[in-house]
């Protein structure tokens, strides 16, 4: 599926979706648009008949979203609970729905849930790995007792989808994050949220991903609020995190 990005796009209701690249990305495939974080591409995809909104809602619900006010399933980790992601998807031709499908607008989600999805992608199974806080206990005599058993979730999306997304994310990391992440074999996706708060405009910078290193198989989610261009990046923080975890092994 190909769509054109000229830097800005008007939907069926004459509402404008802007791209972060003012001159546009030109004609793109889905994989290219994913790597480019191209808003107009995905807005056109949502509006098209190639991707029915009912299918989007079904997929989002399986992934754990509470869609259109429905009560979602709370997330658990060793007795700790977190609220599920929420989003409103009402009209595929409307800005709010198109923006919501892009993770913008009134979409809310926790870093915890984003990392669960990353484990489902990294494993190539479409099932997330259940995390835990304490792996084992060691008593005063040095006897170690394991506290956990590896558990997986129900199917969030197909293994085929998981493997395809994993390939795209690892290609994205290799192409654009080699200088930041060094020799780590990772899959990553960045995101930027434009915020207007009491007249103040700023950006929140996000990076989600996973490491494929056998010695450091982790998922991560890094957020810098009110980030200033030229300062610390989410990718550089990811490198510090992975280095620290590697040193622990």
Language-model segment annotations:
Residues 143-152, 235-249:
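Short, gly/Ser/Thr-rich active-site loops of penicillin-recognizing serine hydrolases
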Residues 1-222:
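Beta-lactam-recognizing serine transpeptidase/beta-lactamase-like catalytic domain environment
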Residues 224-235:
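A short acidic/glycine-rich loop-to-helix N-cap element
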């Amino acid at each position: 599926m190909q769509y054109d990005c000229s830097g800005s796009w008007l939907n069926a209701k004459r509402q404008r979706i802007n791209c972060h690249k003012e001159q546009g990305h030109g004609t793109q495939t889905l994989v290219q648009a994913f790597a480019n974080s191209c808003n107009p591409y995905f807005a056109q995809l949502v509006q098209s008949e190639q991707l029915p909104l009912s299918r989007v809602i079904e997929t989002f619900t399986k992934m754990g979203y509470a869609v259109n006010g429905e009560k979602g399933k709370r997330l658990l980790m060793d007795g700790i609970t977190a609220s599920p992601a929420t989003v409103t998807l009402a009209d595929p031709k409307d800005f709010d729905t198109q923006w919501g499908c892009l993770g913008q607008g009134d979409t809310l989600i926790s870093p915890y849930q984003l990392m669960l999805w990353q484990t489902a992608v990294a494993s190539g199974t479409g099932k997330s790995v259940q995390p835990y806080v304490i792996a084992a206990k060691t008593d005063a005599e040095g006897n170690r007792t394991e506290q956990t058993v590896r558990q997986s979730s129900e199917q969030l999306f197909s293994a085929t989808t998981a493997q395809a997304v994993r390939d795209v994310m690892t290609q994205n990391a290799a192409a654009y994050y080699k200088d930041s992440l060094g020799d780590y074999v990772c899959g990553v996706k960045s995101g930027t949220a434009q915020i207007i708060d009491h007249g103040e405009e700023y950006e929140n910078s996000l990076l989600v991903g996973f490491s494929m290193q056998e010695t450091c198989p982790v998922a991560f989610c890094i957020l810098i609020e009110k980030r200033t261009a030229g300062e610390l990046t989410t990718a550089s923080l990811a490198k510090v995190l992975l280095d620290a975890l590697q040193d622990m092994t």
